Amino acid sequence: MCIRDRDAGAYRSLAEARVRKPAVDWTRVPVPRKTGRYLFCNYPLEELVPLVNWSYFFSAWGLPGRYPALFDDPKRGEEARRVFDDAQRLLSEIVDRRLLRADGVIGLYPAASDGDDIVLYADESRERERMRLPQLRNQQADRERNLSLADFVAPLGSGVKDYVGAFAVTAGLGLEELAGRYRSEGDDYRAIMAKLLADRLTEAFAEALHRYARVTLWGYEREGQWSVGDLLAEKYQGIRPAFGYPSAPDHSLKADVFALMDVGTVTGMTMTESYMIVPGEAACGLMLGHPEARNFSVGRIDSEQLASYAARRGTDSEKMRVLIPQHLIDM
């Protein structure tokens, strides 16, 4: 049966979408060298600079284009070069004077999937559940496979021991004071640029810690195996979807990861009642190591999946509507 959205086409029922999940080869599950939680406080900013994605920086500045080819654009190239030079000077000042601080925490835990849920276990015995992280599933009828992040974690009863990672990072500690000082001096330009640089450093930090997880914790990747360009293009094995990303649109799952790794205690990050991380230049999500794991978009879901997901999250459909309003089918 297909459901039709007035604006966005046809959707499969939840039952049909679940039948169309991908067939994953569970003989390829990576076995980690280490598990547990790892803290990275006051991380060296100079190590993050090479991982900054300047294309995204320019897009946020209103100058879309691929770096460094953007400099040759006949319309935007000159301005892009000027902004880049200014950003380099400010970035050097931030790094040299430690005007921002980067705190992060990652963890790797025994895990399994149970339907559309990811289950994390308390220890390697896998006898006691530590946490359940329900996931959403794509229902679009024009997709050959309807994906959920849970599809890339070995299922209960498979006999395969799998693992799931989590992360929470920020490179925005100190930004409020820094941007406030610039604004008090009448320098809104530098205040805006400092925020965008903190955003980019945060993403670079997430990339750096994901690389650490792949190389040191899972151990399926060698140090230096990928160039910076390859890392920014995400050519490596595994994914790190942050909550709020298209494959994990429910921001409330951040609270679960904060509780899992005690993020608010061991880092400078806090969380509001509306699941916004403070400072705002932060990212929080999951790390999946299976070579077939890939990013995708959940898109819109029907009322049946909304009710199922809400129940698995321990709430009701109306409250969940508030959390993911853009992902509901308009019947």
Question: What does each of the following model-derived ranges do?
Answer:
Residues N146-M331:
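C-terminal accessory domains/tails appended to large, multi-domain proteins
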